[in-house]
From Swiss-Prot:
The gene is pyrB. It catalyses: carbamoyl phosphate + L-aspartate = N-carbamoyl-L-aspartate + phosphate + H(+). GO terms for cellular component: cytosol. PROSITE patterns: CARBAMOYLTRANSFERASE. It comes from Anaplasma phagocytophilum (strain HZ). This is Aspartate carbamoyltransferase catalytic subunit. The keyword Transferase applies. Carbamoyl phosphate binds at residues 53-54, 103, 132, 135, 261-262. Keywords: Pyrimidine biosynthesis, Transferase. Pathway: Pyrimidine metabolism; UMP biosynthesis via de novo pathway; (S)-dihydroorotate from bicarbonate: step 2/3. It comes from the Bacteria.
Amino acid sequence: MKKLNKLLRIQSLSDVDIENIVALAHRYLQDSSANNVLQGRVIANLFFENSTRTLLAFEIAEKSLGAVSVTLNVETSSMKKGESVSDTLSTLSAMGVDLVVVRSGFSGFIDEVVERVGDCCVINAGDGNHEHPTQALTDYATIRYLKGKYIEGLNVTICGDIFHSRVARSNMRLLSRYGANINVVTPPCWSASVPSSNVTKITHSLEEGIKDADVIMLLRIQKERMSGASFISANEYSRHYMLDNAKLSIAKDDVIIMHPGPMNRGIEISDEVADASSSILLQVKMGVAVRKAILHYMLG
């Protein structure tokens, strides 16, 4: 049921695409047994940035669906001998790769990939601080699994480094599309970067931001994307914005705590909140299920 050739950004997805992917993901969450729906398909993972959860989720998904899964080690590839990224992509296409999963630190790089791989399917696994659509789909599927099919009217609070977060941007676009109220908690130094079109409220107070929240989505400080001095020190950030049990007591009893990872314990989330939040582990499991669903939907 090939419905989608390129998954580059949230806007790439129709409502039908999203609904089918979420439905498939929920099925795969309930039944994680391997199958051969992608037998004979070749998928290449091309990651120019470090990754644990996203890369592992794709590799597990690819192999459990019967695909030939190849992860190109950039450090040992011909790119270290001077081969251009464009030539590497053209080589993958010529070798008959069916789908390329790409992560890059450069915003918009995914569009250059599309130009080089012809009819090959492409998935954006994160490009700079631009978008991370598969993580947003994971988060949406998790919220729906825990809160029900319709998220219209839910209060979703996103807290942290909005300025550098591709996860936040994709989630704002996706969740607001289905009627969720997006509230942002961020230090003043990052508030200017918040896109007003997808946001209901911006505050610099964690307590104010979470008091009516149905979902709290925490983001780490992305030091690797900061040039020069940090906008805010880790100590100052943790004093004002770390979610601990005392602050969490302000929120609703049934609030969902989410984090795309990696978590920086003691900075944006305390040990006790991290260890008690079963929804964060569900989010990780859903990450594999969603990647299975996406691959099945695009290649199955």
